[in-house]
Amino acid sequence: MSANAALRCSNFDERRDKAMALFAAKGFGQVSMRELAAHVGLTAGSLYHHFPSKQDLLYDLIEELYEELQATLDQGRKALARGKPALPAVIAAHWQLHAERGLQFRLADRDLCCLSDQQQARLALVRLRYQAGLLKLVAPQTRLSGPALVATGQALGTLLNQLPGWLQGRGLAEDEGLRLMQSLLLGVIERTLKDAVI
């Protein structure tokens, strides 16, 4: 990669991160294109050369997070391959991801409704795949089916995605927060999915 190409990539990532921080701070709907352009150091007209639309940028940020969530399941698969339980590895991966991408979690939680119906539908499919993969990983023998299985996957995914935000920054040491998250989730899973592989 040439020095110019590397600089362009670096500038793009910087601008994208600045846009994400602005959306997270003010809310997607409260940010105008003019304000967004000024915040990332561009003119309003040149902003469209970098991002097709404000909505497309939000979609990319949330889609990237969902792809990273899917990748957290790989940590559980690796743990199983080493003969270890999957859930602690998955929980630790979610904890770390939340520490690294807290702003994206905020956007996905709060501003998903600002996307088009088509964008929301695509992300809903990605989220369902993630939730199904999560259940298959931690409870492959579950007897739940149909709506109960889907609802359980949604609840478990939501807990994994929300607990780090609730626990981080509460004055707990990191290892203490992670242990508390593991304890909470293990309790939920043991009571709901008695045959879960934890």
Model feature map: region roles:
Residues 2-3, 61-88:
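Amphipathic alpha-helical linker/stalk segments
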Residues 85-109, 157, 194:
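Helical hydrophobic small-molecule/effector-binding pocket
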Residues 99-118, 165-168:
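Amphipathic alpha-helical segments used for helix-helix packing
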Residues 25-29, 80, 101:
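Short coil/turn segments at alpha/beta junctions that flank glycine-rich nucleotide-binding fingerprints
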